[in-house]
């Protein structure tokens, strides 16, 4: 993915495993438990074991020269509530609010599946994310010591509540009844205020 930071672009790989047993499930890499269910929506308790992985987490070794003495922005274990719902027979929605030691994130996603043939499904989606100030301060905040230790950082920055919107597309190719190969691509546009952090590139 293209990094929001002054860093090398990152290659992220994740196993996507979908399992269900009674009210327990694993979707992608997030386990959950459905505690309330109706025909067109359900509520779950969920855990994100690698919160931040898909947006702001980064190892210090990935920063470019002039930023290499920054500390890593690590993933975090987050937990919260998820809502899965149907707007109509074609459009599915997912929303979650998760909390961690380094802040809170809200996600809303709407997608629609188009069956290309018996084995291939095309799934476009739109997303909305909200990150609270604590979350953003951990990932893109800058302290005085960061200025002293990194030649290209000129000012401190305190993270602020931030929103982002995005579009994505997934191509789901069924290999067997139990196994699929997924190709995913997308773009996210962040609130312009994050550009006030010297560690963030200005073209996000």
For each of these PLM feature ranges, what is it?
Residues 172-204:
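Predominantly the C-terminal beta-signal and adjacent terminal strand-loop region
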Residues 1-26, 32, 134:
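Short glycine/proline- and aromatic-enriched beta-strand/turn motifs that initiate or cap beta-hairpins
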Residues 27-111, 115-123, 127, 133-159, ...:
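Outer-membrane pore/translocation modules
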Residues 14-18, 110, 204:
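Outer-membrane beta-barrel "beta-signal"
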Residues 16, 46, 127, 182-184:
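Residue-level detection of beta-strand scaffold positions
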Residues 4-8, 96, 196-198:
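Short, solvent-exposed loop/turn segments at secondary-structure boundaries
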Residues 149-174, 179, 185:
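A conserved mid-domain beta-alpha-beta active-site/ligand-binding segment of alpha/beta enzyme cores
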